[in-house]
Amino acid sequence: HHYLAAESGRITRRRKIKGRLHTVRQVAQKRRLIYKENKREYCLLDTDLGPVLQMEVGALLVGRIYNHSQDSLVRGQEKGCFGLGGSTILVLYPAGTIRSDQDILTYSDLGIETQIQMGEKIGEKLCLND
């Protein structure tokens, strides 16, 4: 299960965080703080939108996170892979720089997971006034 860079930019920080390996399924999120407790790795990217954080979260059957060694990323470039099965990627943008599609927001409010594929539209960048 390979994952890609969410944005293009220079990597300014990397961090590995030890943790447990709880399932990342929706039902578990109601009982545990999985994004806080699970093993994870992140990189902070310096992008045209400002700092963007991309974090890979390990899961119950995914004990290993393999990130490629590189100093910068291009949006859509393979960033790494999980050792077994699938897991979760979190991408945090500066406030006011993106707008998520309404269907994703609606499903999230209802506690329904939205699975996406590479190239599928999930939102849009907003115009930034300097």
What are the functions of these language-model segments?
Residues 1-130:
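Contiguous, well-folded functional domains in the mature portion of proteins
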